[in-house]
């Protein structure tokens, strides 16, 4: 995407008409979002929405520079990423969506590692994640199973970029003697699906709606992670598309007409 900085805002040109409620190639009912907050866009970018780079949104929020994402191929208005104060000062700004959820993001570039049979004692988890950090690897979700009473061992599962997985496994293998774990399990046939929206703060039923939509499609949730305005799940890779569509429909985001993608990738 190209960038053009004007006096008061930054224009970013892409091959789509702006930021959409989901990837239009997966959810045909995806709609352009007229306006979205920095914090929601940060979550969307971190969870796989490729249209804006995470660092670009972080910089814009820090400097309070509104971003206008639009298509190089049309004169249609795009998506404004800005804070509410900027929108109030500019009456021509589109209104915020009333939807509880702003969008559904997905990410197929992650893998999952399970460290099985770790002795459940103080400091083991710290040692594991220090080792991974020392290898320069960022991890995403972490789940620790309840320790087994019989043998006092536990399992820790985490997700990380697929491109870093070999380095992580090699680092952990070197520590197997010190940490005393039984096995390392690797799975790259996964995907992460996330719903993002500031409406979650005031609507308690979001988690139930999301999980019910997944259950009705027969989608098994392998891992769950939440922030104040995001819920992310890990599912098997072959269920990512179904999960995106089901979440998009469950939160009433489907539009009547289909989104236009100008023979590009939305990047």
Language-model features: locations:
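Polyanion-binding loop/helix "lid" in catalytic or ligand-binding cores
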Residues: 1, 25-76
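Short, small-residue-biased leader/transition segments that mark boundaries at the very start
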Residues: 3-5
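General beta-strand structural signal in soluble alpha/beta enzymes
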Residues: 9-14, 53-54, 68-71, 141-142, ...
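Short acidic, glycine/serine/threonine-rich loops at helix termini
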Residues: 14, 20-27, 31-32, 54-57, ...
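Residue-level "edge-of-site" marker
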Residues: 15-16, 73, 145, 227
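Short beta-alpha connecting loops at secondary-structure transitions
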Residues: 21-31, 36-46, 110-116, 152-153, ...
